[in-house]
């Protein structure tokens, strides 16, 4: 029975892995935006983590996950003599890679970490039925990679400790790679393994070869990581330059995150936020069950002896010291804690667990900013189709310049625009984020050509400040746009003509319970869900009639 349940949950995980939801900008801008721009020459806008004088993000642990699949796709398309791979294919291939890593490495690690077969089956089903596994773990987060590295770090530590007759040289060498990759991936990684590594160090006097294997290979992998980062950020650097001025991203990251003034830019939280807000958000009814079981003294004693529980709770406590706390920072705790839960046959728990994960699974895995990826993938074809008549009137091979204004959404990943050289398009993306509606209108007033400059459509300029066409992408739940929807009277200053929409999109940032009330807000955000693309034009001189 449990095998059929597990296979069903595996299909659910695959469904969410291939659903284009958008949980957080970091899943694109701290990985795919970088490698798609560098390898495929797609449009890209690197975040400050990669462009500052002291970059804080390492490419060493990311290249095998993102760079290798993208490079293989590029090689295949080059060998077949075709153009660059479409951005949509790259997106789903990398998502498929994340699904396989989650299925193979995460589940395998849970299988190895839980010793008793009866408890192992329950642990596998609990982890496989968590919405965090369906969504966060199949997205391109550094936290998702951290989860795998933490889990396998614990697996190897268990093997080293249990194997008392041999030195476990190979396990120590692999553990050293995991530690280096984990630290270069996220500086929070040591918090999850510090207690477990203490047990390994305790055994070193009896097995000195294990010590030399761990430290020796660790130094080798550290040097490789520093060399990879230095040559990435300084492509023209020689070997001597790498030795003189290496780029050590974990050190830069640590210096940045230990400065509270820097953390304040990202949002400060109370120190109890991880325990009282983030863990309940990730675990739901499972956390309630753990708290209820904590009243059993024997259960508490067993948890302190449990390496998985001790690692998760100690890491949560250490990460709570820092005032910037997001739920995804605790993603590695989810499989560790769920694998410790002793679930009895309870219909109440089962019902609550199913409802909790189904609700958050569809919210975070399908609807949360779900239209951003699909819309960005569709933008080139929408612009090309809309402006086809203008394009036919152009002379020569001049490109058509289009400005796309994104409003009240997460930042659109530019790499999803792909290679548009064959469409003869030059797309300028303006991200207005959550600016007030009045500022958005001012931006459109500045960009949209007036009726007196209508000839611009056939007399192109090379300036992106004066586009040939202006498009607006915004949630359909934003009622502010209703006053501009076509048709408008000729006396109006702006008119928005809807061209395209994606229904599975909900913007939680658009919730305004204080001004509108709870029920009206939920009715608006859910009832008018979707992301739309509009053509902005002057009603007195429409390029396209509604």
From Swiss-Prot:
Highest taxon of source: Eukaryota
Q: In which pathway does it act?
A: Glycolipid biosynthesis; glycosylphosphatidylinositol-anchor biosynthesis
Instruction: Tell me one Pfam family matched here.
Output: Glyco_transf_22
Where in the cell? Endoplasmic reticulum membrane
* Transmembrane domains' residue ranges: 5-25, 58-78, 96-116, 141-161, 174-194, 208-228, 348-368
Q: Which UniProt keywords apply?
A: Endoplasmic reticulum, Glycoprotein, Glycosyltransferase, GPI-anchor biosynthesis, Membrane, Transferase, Transmembrane, Transmembrane helix
Instruction: Provide the residues annotated with a glycan attachment (glycosylation).
Output: 420
GO MF assignments: alpha-1,2-mannosyltransferase activity
GO biological process annotations for this chain's record? GPI anchor biosynthetic process
Is the Translocase keyword given for this protein? Answer: no
InterPro entries per the record? GPI_mannosylTrfase
> Might you give the EC number(s) for this enzyme?
2.4.1.-
An example of a Gene Ontology cellular component annotation for this protein is: endoplasmic reticulum membrane
What family classification does the UniProt entry report for this protein? Belongs to the glycosyltransferase 22 family. PIGZ subfamily.
Instruction: State the name under which the record lists this protein.
Output: GPI mannosyltransferase 4
